[in-house]
A protein has these predicted regions:
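N-terminal glycine-/charge-rich "phosphate-binding" loop or analogous flexible N-terminal tail
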Residues: 1-40, 314-316
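Phosphate-binding beta-alpha-beta segment of Rossmann-like dinucleotide-binding domains, i.e.
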Residues: 83, 90-137, 149-152, 156, ...
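Glycine-rich Rossmann-fold phosphate-binding loop(s) that bind the pyrophosphate
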Residues: 143-144
Length: 316
């Protein structure tokens, strides 16, 4: 939200809220947050590291953490609960743009579009063979809001659909969309495209590792738009180098920004993006508003008039 916060200053002023706007490149580290300890009552944050140590020194003044977006794995929820800090997020925030990013990656790999573009610009005239999505099986790991949206869209392309989740998925959705729920090993062994759409928690940390990658078919492509640590990155690099899978599309990484020396940067069969699959000004605007709403609720301020308050016009 930082690039747009000035647009919403009139709304914060309406509620007599003073703003502290730190300089942030990607996220605030534990040490950087400690510098603001005791100086704020609430925060709208991204993936800033609200550890137990940070929360302990920020309370009792800190009352609410409003996460801009969905994932709250960077917040120590147990410590927040113990210290009386409410935590809010914006579920279903970026379902559509993330789902469309997954479909874009699948189409790019299936139709070999980036590789033909590179060849043409290098002066070559090479007809690289492609496949259609209707020939392929998609396996979605994490059939939540984003996972469901990916499956619905993939169904329109005639793909065979597999799902895996640790919670039971409504039978109506599965029947309506022709999704077969199965075990993770079976999904990995059968899928041509594997889309990771699960949240990061103790059950999903390094879910994709050397052992699970050994189950993947050599022609498969791994797509991760969820959280970087869901994948054991060194194990993925090794698997790609060994030809255990044919490619990967990665929007998230174990360390962000991705280090310049990462082997992933030089792999021709890997597509990379800087944690940007949520990119959509339309959906950003909804998340801005909902993040402010969660902040106000945590500060026990009235929200009835929030929707009537206007931010400054968005630059064209």
């Amino acid at each position: 939200m930082l690039p747009f916060v000035e647009r919403f200053r009139p709304i914060f002023e309406h509620y007599n809220l003073d703003l502290i706007i730190p300089e942030v490149h990607e996220r605030l580290s534990e040490e950087e947050l400690l510098a603001y300890a005791g100086k704020f009552d609430g925060t709208i944050c991204g993936d800033d590291r609200y550890t137990r140590r940070v929360l302990a020194v920020c309370t009792p003044r800190l009352k609410v953490i409003s996460k801009w977006g969905t994932g709250i794995d960077s917040i120590d929820l147990a410590a927040a609960s113990e210290l009386g800090v409410s935590v809010g997020n914006t579920p279903n925030a970026f379902t559509v743009p993330v789902a469309e990013s997954v479909l874009g990656y699948m189409l790019a790999f299936a139709r070999r579009l980036p590789w033909m573009d590179d060849a043409m610009k290098a002066g070559q005239w090479e007809k690289i063979p492609g496949i259609t999505l209707s020939e392929c099986t998609l396996g979605v790991v994490g059939v939540g809001n984003v996972g469901k949206a990916v499956l619905r869209r993939a169904r329109a392309f005639g793909m065979k659909l597999l799902g895996n989740d640790i919670v039971e998925i409504a039978p109506d959705f599965l029947v309506e969309n022709g999704v077969e729920m199965t075990t993770l090993p079976d999904l990995l062994a059968r899928a041509d495209f594997i889309s990771l759409n699960c949240s990061l928690n103790p059950t999903s940390y390094h879910l994709i590792n050397a052992q699970t990658l050994s189950l993947v078919r050599p022609s498969a492509v791994l797509i991760n738009t969820s959280r970087g640590p869901v994948v054991d990155e060194p194990a993925l690099v090794q698997a790609l180098q060994a030809g255990q899978l044919s490619g990967a599309a990665l929007d998230v990484f174990e360390q962000e920004p991705l280090p310049a020396e990462s082997p992933l940067r030089s792999m021709p069969n890997v597509m990379l993006a800087p944690h940007n699959s949520n990119s959509s000004p339309f959906y950003w605007e909804r998340v801005h508003r909902n993040s402010i709403r969660n902040l106000l609720l945590g500060l026990q301020l009235p929200v009835e008039d929030l929707d009537s308050l206007r931010a400054e016009a968005q630059p064209q």
